[in-house]
């Protein structure tokens, strides 16, 4: 059995009939064919994903899960099968558009340029409500103090984050960049990426299959 969230497009989601679809669902099916296994892909809420794996409700996680040192304390990962960068997103016309930051920040590198970019973000996000999915690397980053003491609002799913961003209940949101671009393309909503992309450090080292230790 393989666990996935079914609520994080384009990685994994559900069609109108409730069937699991997405890049990871297709990848899991192909891997099972190659290994000649009969696999069942099951849906699991994100915040219970790792506990469910540990409790043997399924044998592996394929759910857009980034490989981080913190998660390695509880589970093991395969080699990464995809790169992922995070990004802030706002509605077009936001005052946060045009922030003077580098195109990307790798937190693993550190150095003066990273510190300068984080200071710019800290100033820009002061007093803003930043929305993100609970139990994610994005929540961990926002609550780490790297961008000051921001007002973080968390949600059970990325769909809920997108809804509150477009309805104006969030000033800005943080997630995988592809989650926002996919949503903007499919919904037609004027959601735009702002600031730098984020990788390394708290954001991990790519996306991998989570496996019990």
Model regions and ranges:
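Extracytoplasmic small-molecule ligand-binding "clamshell" domains
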Residues: 1-65, 73
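Periplasmic-binding protein-like
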Residues: 6, 83-87, 178-181, 185-213
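Short secondary-structure boundary segments
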Residues: 6, 65-66, 92, 134, ...
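Short helix-initiation/N-cap motifs at beta->coil->alpha
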Residues: 25, 40-51, 114-117, 152-167
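Short, hydrophobic alpha-helical packing/hinge segments within bilobed ligand-binding/sensory domains
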Residues: 27-28, 49-52, 58, 138, ...
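A local structural motif
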Residues: 29-43, 124-126, 144-157, 169
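Alpha-to-beta junction loops
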Residues: 36-38, 44, 54-63, 128-129, ...
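A conserved helix-loop-strand patch within extracytoplasmic ligand-binding domains
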Residues: 37, 66-67, 73-130, 135
């Amino acid at each position: 059995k393989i666990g996935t969230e079914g609520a994080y497009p384009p990685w994994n989601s559900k069609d109108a009939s409730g069937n699991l679809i997405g890049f990871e669902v297709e990848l899991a099916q192909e891997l099972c064919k190659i290994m000649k296994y009969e696999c069942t892909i099951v849906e699991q809420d994100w915040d219970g994903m790792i506990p469910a794996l540990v409790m043997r409700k399924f044998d592996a996680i394929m759910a857009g899960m980034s490989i981080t040192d913190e998660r390695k304390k509880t589970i093991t990962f395969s080699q990464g099968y995809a790169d992922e960068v995070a990004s802030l997103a706002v509605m077009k016309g936001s005052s946060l558009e045009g922030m003077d930051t580098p195109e990307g920040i790798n937190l693993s590198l550190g150095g003066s340029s990273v510190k300068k970019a984080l200071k710019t973000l800290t100033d820009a996000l002061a007093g803003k409500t930043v929305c993100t999915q609970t139990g994610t690397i994005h929540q961990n980053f926002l609550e780490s103090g790297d961008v000051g003491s921001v007002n973080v609002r968390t949600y059970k799913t990325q769909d809920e984050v997108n809804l509150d961003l477009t309805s104006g209940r969030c000033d800005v949101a943080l997630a995988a960049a592809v989650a926002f671009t996919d949503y903007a393309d499919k919904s037609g909503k004027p959601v735009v990426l702002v600031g730098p992309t984020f990788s390394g450090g708290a954001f991990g080292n790519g996306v991998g299959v989570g496996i019990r230790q």
